[in-house]
């Protein structure tokens, strides 16, 4: 989105393919948009497309809380298939908010309903640090490190999803009212 050549395929996906992928139950796309001004359409400033997936951790990551599952070659995951932010809004936490949405969907809805241990993505090389800041880990296999778009994963069971522990939220009393 915006003039960056690396992101042109991401922009064309949103305008040309996202709806058909969603209609065919291949991927669901969520957009971040600014409200419409003076009768114009809302302005899309970012989007994320999610799909069901699995991740082969190559024996490099063991589940400590479910050792028996370690015998399986892959684990259930939700995949960030596409993530894009308009160039005018990079650095303004739009991408972070969209990744947070994916985490919330995986942890609060998908995981408890059908089982989903990981959030995964095939990261563009220049986006690896973005995903690392979001808590993702680069899969440490030689094959993965040689890929143009290496696999990164986030173990949803390792997250502290208790809102009471979020320093960005105001403290609350036991009855839920602000402190």
List each language-model region with its residue ranges.
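Non-catalytic substrate-recognition and accessory regions of acyl/acetyltransferase enzymes
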Residues: 1-92, 96-124, 128-179
């Amino acid at each position: 989105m915006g003039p960056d050549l690396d992101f042109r395929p991401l922009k064309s996906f949103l305008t040309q393919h996202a709806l058909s992928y969603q209609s065919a139950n291949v991927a669901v796309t969520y957009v971040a948009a600014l409200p419409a001004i003076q009768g114009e359409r809302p302005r899309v400033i970012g989007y994320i497309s999610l799909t069901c997936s699995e991740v082969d951790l190559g024996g490099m990551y063991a589940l400590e809380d479910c050792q028996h599952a370690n015998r399986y070659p892959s684990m259930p995951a939700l995949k960030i298939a596409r993530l894009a932010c308009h160039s005018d809004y990079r650095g303004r936490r739009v991408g972070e908010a969209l990744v947070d949405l994916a985490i919330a969907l995986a942890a609060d809805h998908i995981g408890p309903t059908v089982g989903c241990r990981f959030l995964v993505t095939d990261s563009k090389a220049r986006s690896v640090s973005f995903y690392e800041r979001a808590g993702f880990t680069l899969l440490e296999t030689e094959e993965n490190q040689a890929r143009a778009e290496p696999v990164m994963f986030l173990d949803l069971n390792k997250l502290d999803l208790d809102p009471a522990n979020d320093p960005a939220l105001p403290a609350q009393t036991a009855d839920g009212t602000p402190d």
